[in-house]
Structures are given as structure tokens and as C-alpha cells.
């Protein structure tokens, strides 16, 4: 009597493939666009950029006949065209914080770090994806804001053209500024790892610290204020000589602040437990 040996086939494990930076970026893109707060915050930033520009330009156009010659001489329409950036940066910065802190609050960050044991590619992917999405939306928004303002001012014969010196740099620079502000918020959020704390830190640095500088001696204020993130970054949107920093120098300094925040976040991400 002979026995027949039987073998049981083992189930094949799914092939997950190598974890690459591109795959991590695609995963972060899926997460970013699936979150409702992303759509609302980005929509708010676009509406603020265009809507406030239209409203501010309309108000100035209405009061233009009653303005003195001195006020008209000091007025530059581009500052009004880009007025919406002041509020849009709040939406962009807060969303930057939420991009990372929302995962900590839900515990989802553990799954992300388990899938990518090296950890750092997750933070890099968030920065890459959020930066590209912000830039892709804000460039059209600032361009539309400029066109809307230009069309309103034409009725008062206030001429401003995209070809004028510094105008193109200021308009495109506004989109670049908002993008880096978002990355700065992302870096702060990754450092704090708490939504309320991250937003408070971002708002404190960007909006509370500059007014507090006014209580310092004038010489100190004049020396330090241009180097704060808000003033330094917005130098790229200025076409007057009032700012102490040159446009690209100020923008480079803001990029340095964002890079420093992301660098500190990277170090802490490797050293701390999730």
C-alpha cells in the first residue's frame, strides 16, 4: 500500500513594492484631496485673494475723486490689488498646520510611519504636495486679482500694467509668498504636533509678533521688524523702496524660516516616538 504525499499550497503574499518618494507623494496627494478642510481652506484663500482685491479696488475707485493730490501721489494700485493676500495667508498657514497635526490628532500618523519606517519621506512628501498644490492655485488667484483690480481702476484712468517694472515680480511673488507661508505652517505643525498649539504658534509669529514690536524702542523696532517672517516675505510684493529688505532678499529670508522649521521638524520626527 502506497501513500500519496499531498502538499498544501501557501497563499501568496501581496507584492507591496518598494517604498519610494514618488509613491509616498502620491499617497499624501490622495490624503490631502480627500480631506474636506483642504477644499474649504483652499477655496477660502482663493476667494479672499480675488474677492478682497475687487472690494478694495472698488472702494478706492469710489473715493478717488475726493482724494487729495498728495494722497493720489502716494497711492500705488498694486498694494490694493494684492490686499487679499493678507487674509489668504491665514487660511494657507492654518491649513499647513492641519496637514500634519490632523494625523496626530486622529492617530493616523502611526499608520503612515509604519508604512514608511524611515519617517522623513512622509514629511518631505507632505511639504512637496502641499507646496505644489498651493502654488498651482495661488498663481491663477493672484493673476485674476490683478486683472480684476486693473479693470476697475481703468475707469478712473489709474494705469497699472503687468509690464511695469516690478509688477510681474510682485504678482507672481504673492503666490510664492503664500506657498512658503503654507510650508512654514506645516513645519510649525510638525514641531508642535498639536492643532491648537500649531495654529497659535503660527498666528503668534505672523500676526501678533509684528505689532508687539511697536512697544520696543524705535531704533530696535526699525532694526528688527524687517527681518520678521511677515515683513521679510512680503518684501517680494512691494515695488516701493519703503521696505528695508530687497524683494528677493526678504523672500529668501522667509524661505530660510520655512526651511529651518522643516529641518527642526525632521530632526524631531526621527528622534521622537509617534
State what each model feature region is.
Residues 2-18, 38, 42-97, 123-191, ...:
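Secretory targeting signals
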Residues 21-33:
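A short amphipathic helical element positioned immediately N-terminal to and/or at the very start
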Residues 28, 116-118, 188, 194, ...:
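Generic structural signal for small/hydrophobic residues in well-ordered secondary structure
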Residues 33-35, 191-192, 271:
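Helix-loop interface residues and adjacent transmembrane-helix termini in multi-pass membrane transporters
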Residues 39, 120, 196-197:
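Residues that define the loop-to-transmembrane-helix transition and helix capping
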Residues 51, 195-230:
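Transmembrane helix segments
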Residues 93-115, 119-120, 127:
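Transmembrane helix boundary and interhelical loop/hinge segments in multi-pass membrane proteins
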